[in-house]
């Protein structure tokens, strides 16, 4: 039977991929984080639901794998893209622990990650090389996150930041800004997008020096331009290098 890991739960229905919608419709059981399941309730009224809360990812994915082994068609819901800070990797790791002859098939269905949705709202900030960095230190040491941010800034990558702030991480974004300021001008464009792709999405365009941290929360995606990025007509533009 097919164990499906898919995405799009955080998007408005028009933004979900057709393949993801079809996978949901063909599944017997939907497994996911309660918040994400609520976002697709219009599509799963007739499905069996297995949901749980934050920091229960292993239990959630193990349940999905167990159900698939039993013969059910299971859809595991991730926000954005399942392969970008989502559940795809965990599901595949758990499947590898099952004897080969009993392993369920798994199809990873791509979706629209927050960096891309945020970039579209801001204009064209990701037109050149970029790095995506999460500031969550639940599974990655803060020192390693800082090192990655420093190297990305030194390499002049556009930087997309996930999980920039939470109740327990109120200063991390400011620390990253100070790291990037060692390599970028204070006027470097910065975009903050809240609820990317969801109802109520809004965004702010500012600069690295004046980054309005009061506009940032755990539902925000922050994009910091590179040395060539600029602001024009309410957009952040990162030139690709075309001769104009």
Q: Which sequence ranges carry the predicted segments?
A:
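Single conserved hydrophobic/aromatic residue that forms the stacking wall/gate
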Residues: 1-8, 12-13
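Short beta-strand segments
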Residues: 8, 76-79, 109, 133-136, ...
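Class I S-adenosyl-L-methionine
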Residues: 10, 14-106, 212
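Class I SAM-dependent methyltransferase SAM-binding "motif I" and its flanking Rossmann-like core
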Residues: 18, 86-155
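A polyampholytic, Gly/Pro-enriched intrinsically disordered region
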Residues: 72-78, 124-135, 154-155, 209-218
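Gly/Ser/Thr-rich loops at beta-strand to alpha-helix junctions
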Residues: 80-85, 112-114, 166-167
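A contiguous loop/helix-start segment that scaffolds small-molecule binding in enzyme catalytic cores
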Residues: 154-244
């Amino acid at each position: 039977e097919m164990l499906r890991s898919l995405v799009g739960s955080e998007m408005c229905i028009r933004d979900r991929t057709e393949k993801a919608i079809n996978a949901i419709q063909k599944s017997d059981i939907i497994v996911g984080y309660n918040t994400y399941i609520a976002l697709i309730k219009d599509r799963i009224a007739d499905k069996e639901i297995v949901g749980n809360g934050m920091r229960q990812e292993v239990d959630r994915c193990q349940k999905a794998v167990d159900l698939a082994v039993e013969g059910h068609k299971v859809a595991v819901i991730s926000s954005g893209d399942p392969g970008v800070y989502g559940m795809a990797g965990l599901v595949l790791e758990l499947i590898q622990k099952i004897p080969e002859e009993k392993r369920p098939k798994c199809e990873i269905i791509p979706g629209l990650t927050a960096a891309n949705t945020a970039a579209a709202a801001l204009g064209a900030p990701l037109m050149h090389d970029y790095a995506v960095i999460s500031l969550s230190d639940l599974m990655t040491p803060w020192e390693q996150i800082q090192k990655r941010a420093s190297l990305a800034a030194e390499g002049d990558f556009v930087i997309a930041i996930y999980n920039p702030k939470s109740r327990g991480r109120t200063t991390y974004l400011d620390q990253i800004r100070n790291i990037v300021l060692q390599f970028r001008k204070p006027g470097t464009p910065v975009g903050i997008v809240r609820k990317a792709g969801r109802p109520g999405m809004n965004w702010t365009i500012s600069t690295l020096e004046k980054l309005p941290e009061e506009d940032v929360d755990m539902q925000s995606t922050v994009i910091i331009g590179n040395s060539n990025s600029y602001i024009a007509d309410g957009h952040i533009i990162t030139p690709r290098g075309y001769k104009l």
